[in-house]
Amino acid sequence: MKYSVQHGLPDRDRVRVCVEKAYGAYEERLSDYKPKLDWEAEDRATIAFTVMSQSITAVVEFNEEELRIDGKVPFLFKPFQAKIESVLGSEMEKWLEKARNGEI
C-alpha cells in the first residue's frame, strides 16, 4: 500500500500534528483493533493495528515537501487494499487541508 502527497505546509511540526490528528480520528473508532502510533524519529512513525489476528502496519514519513505512507497489507486483506489506501489518503488530506487553512 502506497500513498504520497505534497503537503504544502511550511514546517515539519505542522505535518506531524496532521499525522497525529488523522491517527486520533481513527484511534477511538478502531479501538477494538488495538491501534498504535509509534514515532521512530521526528519525521517517521509507524501505525499498526490488528484485525482477525492479522497485523496491518504502515510507515508514515515526511520531509519539507512530501508526506508518504507505505504499508503492508496481509494477503487476506488484499481485496480491500484500494479502499484502505483511499480511506488513509482522504483522512490525511482532510487534516492537511485544515492545517493549510490555519485551522490547526
What is the predicted function of each stretch?
Residues 1-18, 24-29, 34:
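Terminal, regulation- and interaction-focused segments at domain boundaries
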Residues 77-104:
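A conserved amphipathic terminal alpha-helix motif
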Residues 49-53, 72-77:
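Secondary-structure transition/turn motif
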Residues 35-40, 60:
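Short, exposed beta-strand/loop patches in secreted or surface proteins that constitute
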Residues 48-66:
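A short, structured beta-strand/loop element
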Residues 39-47:
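Short, hydrophobic/aromatic-rich segments at coil-to-beta transitions
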